[in-house]
Swiss-Prot record:
Additional information: There are at least 4 actin isoforms expressed during artemia development.
Pfam families in the cross-refs: Actin
GO cellular component: cytoplasm; cytoskeleton
Function: Actins are highly conserved proteins that are involved in various types of cell motility and are ubiquitously expressed in all eukaryotic cells. Multiple isoforms are involved in various cellular functions such as cytoskeleton structure, cell mobility, chromosome movement and muscle contraction.
Disulfide bridge map: none
GO terms assigned for molecular function: ATP binding; hydrolase activity
Keywords for this protein: ATP-binding, Cytoplasm, Cytoskeleton, Hydrolase, Nucleotide-binding
Organism name: Artemia sp. (Brine shrimp)
Cross-referenced SUPFAM superfamilies: Actin-like ATPase domain (SSF53067)
Protein name: Actin, clone 302
Location (main, coarse): cytoplasm
Length: 327
């Protein structure tokens, strides 16, 4: 009997345990739990000794300075890594798509960001954050399924709804038209078998759930949708690079995995942008993992080898070294 379970094992025992997420809105809020996850990752999943390998960590855009220092400190002092580096998630996704200039819409479980990147560097003044992501969509799906008479409340049941979301939801190209289709026929209905064998049917919920990304008012939020947020990010950039951003709009993260999302983004941004502008939305099939893939690319570059923060540099300068070496 262990005092804590991590990852898939925590999920499989979720009925008898309390499930906790140490990362909120993309930023680590519980360092003790985060340390447990890292420990589990090194020793149980990767089965590598962290003191024998350099470690590349990723962070949310606009991650607080104290957080970057804390990550650095834990890696060197708790795990004794010989070297480490912290890279911004969206930048790695862009690398994974084979680009160094573009705008990344990165949407995961807790937060979404639009990050304009020029020649490999994120432009901090133009980064926008949207506290609307996968977990909010799961909660919203729980809510609208309740209206249909299906109740999901516990942390275990939330995970079932997350699975329904991942398997059956999609983004409509034209929301009003899709609602009309759903009302007049059963062509959009799908059934889903719950773990206890009960079968539920869902219809317009399939596209109403991710529609909240484009219409946050569905969640009672007074904020711009992902399309407008991306547009606003582009408009905060120098006029000379906007053309490159419009033509290289890259989707990344699990919450961009809904079928139909790229076509809808194309349509919405085309409506916002200048009329002659070439707009291209890039949605790589592996975008759920593109941050990891980009990290793998970065860490294997010969030019990157002098970028690592070494244990020696850390011992000389302390955690603040991260701001001088990782930007």
């Amino acid at each position: 009997q262990k005092d804590s379970y991590v990852g898939d094992e925590a999920q499989s025992k979720r009925g008898i345990l309390t499930l906790k997420y140490p990362i909120e809105h993309g930023v680590v809020t519980n360092w003790d739990d985060m340390e447990k996850i890292w420990h589990h990752t090194f020793y149980n999943e990767l089965r590598v000794a962290p003191e024998e390998h350099p470690v590349l960590l990723t962070e949310a855009p606009l991650n607080p300075k104290a957080n970057r220092e804390k990550m650095t400190q834990i890696m060197f002092e708790t795990f004794n890594t010989p070297a480490m580096y912290v890279a911004i998630q969206a930048v790695l996704s862009l690398y994974a798509s084979g680009r160094t200039t573009g705008i990344v819409l990165d949407s995961g479980d807790g937060v979404s960001h639009t990050v304009p990147i020029y020649e490999g560097y994120a432009l901090p003044h133009a980064i926008l954050r949207l506290d609307l992501a996968g977990r909010d969509l799961t909660d919203y799906l729980m809510k609208i399924l309740t209206e249909r008479g299906y109740t999901f409340t516990t942390t275990a049941e939330r995970e079932i709804v997350r699975d329904i979301k991942e398997k059956l939801c999609y983004v409509a190209l034209d929301f009003e038209q899709e609602m009309a289709t759903a009302a007049s026929s059963t062509s959009l209905e799908k059934s889903y078998e719950l773990p206890d064998g009960q079968i539920i049917t869902i219809g317009n919920e399939r596209f109403r759930c991710p529609e909240a990304l484009f219409q946050p008012s569905f969640l009672g939020m007074e904020t711009c949708g992902i399309h407008e947020t991306a547009y606003n990010s582009i408009m905060k950039c120098d006029v000379d690079i906007r053309k490159d951003l419009y033509a290289n709009t890259v989707l990344s993260g699990g919450t961009t995995m809904f079928p139909g999302i790229a076509d809808r983004m194309q349509k919405e941004i085309t409506m916002l942008a200048p009329s002659s502008m070439k707009i291209k939305i890039i949605a790589p099939p592996e975008r759920k993992y593109s941050v990891w893939i980009g990290g793998s690319i970065l860490a294997s570059l010969s030019t990157f080898q002098q970028m690592w923060i070494s244990k020696q540099e850390y011992d000389e300068s302390g955690p603040s070294i991260v701001h001088r070496k990782c930007f």
